[in-house]
């Protein structure tokens, strides 16, 4: 509308004005894409999920915004495959891990994604939590900021990491068929 007023005032040739208007057309208002995922929450009666959406930083160009050695296709394949497993994503704070995860959620639209705080794994020994996880079969669970589990396993007993490995690689993992994608705010 601003351009329209400006052009009408400064041009007597309306055909030229229309050409200029076509050239300076505003972008569509809704250019953002939306991703949908579920947040795992603890309640008084157990565990449940709440649907969440995000529309920020989804349409990123992986080749343009990340290093050449980023294995995006491997992360995508991991999220789309059938089975259990564990994938790790390392990077300093602000390096784009969360944006990359949103891109994965968008690109793998046939996969169910759940966001879970890593501390919830403390509940893994409870039958109630295991029953809850059975309801999430063939999904990807994303846990961000897992760096505190990087303690040396030979000097400290770490039941959380042992439970995570059991869920993703043991017989329990075969039954659950869940893949975990964990991020760490650390450089390799």
Language-model features: locations:
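Conserved catalytic/switch belt of AAA+ P-loop NTPases
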Residues: 148-188
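Signal for well-folded cores of large energy- and translation-related assemblies
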Residues: 76, 80, 109, 134, ...
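AAA+ P-loop ATPase mechanoenzymes
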Residues: 1-70, 77
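Loop/turn-to-beta-strand initiation segments
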Residues: 111-112, 136-140, 174-181
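A conserved segment at the C-terminal end of the G1
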Residues: 102-108
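Walker A/P-loop nucleotide-binding motif
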Residues: 82-100
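Walker B catalytic acidic pair
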Residues: 144-146
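Short glycine-rich substrate-engagement loop in P-loop NTPases that contacts/grips substrate
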Residues: 108-136, 158
